[in-house]
Structures are given as C-alpha cells and as structure tokens.
C-alpha cells in the first residue's frame, strides 16, 4: 500500500476469517492488513468465493474474524456499539438492492437512515429529497419501491446510503445485472463523488472508470495490483458490417 499522511477512516490489522468449525474450517481471509484513507477510490476484484464480500462484512462487524482487529479512526472496535458507530459513517451498498429496501415508497427508504442517525422527521425528509435530487432521482419520492426496475432499485439503495452522509462507501457489485443505461448512470454518479470507497466488481471496465487503485484477493490474502487504464482497440474483419458477436 502507498504511504498516506491522513488518518485512516478504518483499518484492518491481521484479520483472519474462515467458515465452519475450528477442526474443519475453510479459511477465507488470512492475516489481512489494510487501511482506507479519505479520497481513495479502490477497485476490488477476484473470483467468486475469494472473500470479497466477507471482507466487507468483517469491516462492518457483520462477520467477526477469528483473529485480528478492526479500527475506526484509529480506535479498536470490540463491541456491537463500536461497530454501530462505524456503520453510521461507512455506508455498505449490498449486492442485491432488495436486501436494503424495506419500505413501500422511495422517500421512506431514503429517509430511514437519517432518522436512525437521530434527525427529526422533517429534517430526514428534506435530506432524503435533497439526496434523491443530487443523484438524478428527483420525482422518485412517491414511487413504490417494489415496482422499480433493477437499475432504479440500485440507485435508490445508493441514495439510501448517501443520505446518511458517509465518510466512506463499500459497494458490492453495484452494476451486477444492470443494462448499459443503468450501468452508465452508476458510473456517472460514482465519478462525481469524492467519498472514499471500495468497490467490488467483476466488471473490469467499470472499475477502470471509477477507481484509481486496485486490489485483489487471492489465496486468502489481499494484494495490490498495478494500475490499468480503460482503452479500446480498433479491429476489422470480412463481413464486419453484418451483425456479429465477439
């Protein structure tokens, strides 16, 4: 990892995690050290089952490692109350938006986080409306959540997290299953945000457009990757003007 002169938002120190009982445990993460600093935009990729989502769950206290420590602004987190403080400031956008949206209308879903932070109902409503407007979702307030498209649900789940004004974002496959238009909207929104973030994706082109540093998980360890750049190749072949696939 590169040197930083700012205090880390959160850090992992020697995190090891596995599934199962001690005598038959399947290791997923081993001795992971990592820190996220303000302004960092990190893309995280790796094969299915490599531990990417588990890493997010360890950061947020939804999974407790067998060893190691999570720190928030330099302070170790031990209790559920400690992790609650982190979750108020580190927004976790789940892979499946339906797991994050619970209320009949979009406005209720987006206002829920600010209400949980202690804002008065009117303040939470205003913040939700402002967040929806900032993300290009003005007019969605009274839409029924269950009738939204997959892409719209992803955007609303992001709005629900952004309404809490987080210091950092954890995004788990934010473009999974989206069409090109919805995917581009996510790219445009993320490109406009200064919020520190880690984004899990199998879509390398998406990561190249929205991240400036890259990590992968292999053999239970977190590894830095060399920067890559989005680019296109020209090509030609006979009958290239006919409909075809690559």
Residue ranges and their predicted role:
Residues 45-47:
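The feature captures the beta-strand-to-loop junction immediately N-terminal to the Walker
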Residues 60:
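Helix-to-loop junction immediately C-terminal to a conserved catalytic motif
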Residues 68-78, 86:
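Conserved ABC transporter NBD signature motif
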Residues 122-140:
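Conserved ABC ATPase "signature" region
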Residues 144-148, 152:
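Conserved ABC ATPase signature
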Residues 169-172:
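Catalytic Walker B motif of ABC-type/P-loop ATPase nucleotide-binding domains
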Residues 201-202:
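H-loop/switch region of ABC-family ATPase nucleotide-binding domains
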């Amino acid at each position: 990892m590169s040197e930083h002169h700012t205090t880390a938002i959160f850090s992992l120190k020697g995190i090891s995690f596995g599934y199962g009982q001690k005598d038959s445990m399947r290791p997923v993460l081993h001795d992971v050290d990592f820190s996220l600093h303000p302004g960092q935009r990190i893309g995280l990729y790796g094969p299915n089952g490599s531990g990417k989502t588990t890493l997010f769950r360890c950061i947020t206290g939804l999974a407790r490692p067998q060893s190691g420590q999570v720190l928030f602004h330099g302070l170790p987190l031990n209790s559920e109350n400690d992790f609650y403080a982190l979750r108020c400031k580190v927004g976790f956008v789940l892979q499946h938006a339906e797991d994050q949206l619970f209320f009949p209308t979009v406005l209720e879903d987006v206002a829920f986080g600010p209400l949980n932070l202690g804002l008065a109902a009117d303040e939470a409503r205003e913040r939700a409306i402002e967040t929806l407007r900032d993300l290009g979702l003005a007019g969605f307030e009274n839409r029924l959540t269950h009738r939204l498209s997959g892409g719209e649900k992803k955007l609303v789940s992001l709005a629900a997290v952004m309404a809490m004004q987080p210091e950092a974002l954890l995004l788990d496959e934010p473009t999974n299953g989206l069409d090109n238009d919805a995917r581009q909207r996510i790219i445009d929104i993320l490109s406009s945000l200064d919020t520190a973030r880690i984004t899990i994706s199998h879509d390398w082109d998406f990561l190249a457009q929205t991240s400036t540093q890259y990590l992968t998980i292999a053999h239970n360890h977190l590894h830095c990757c060399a920067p890559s750049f989005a680019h296109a190749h020209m090509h030609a072949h006979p009958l290239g003007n006919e409909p075809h696939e690559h």
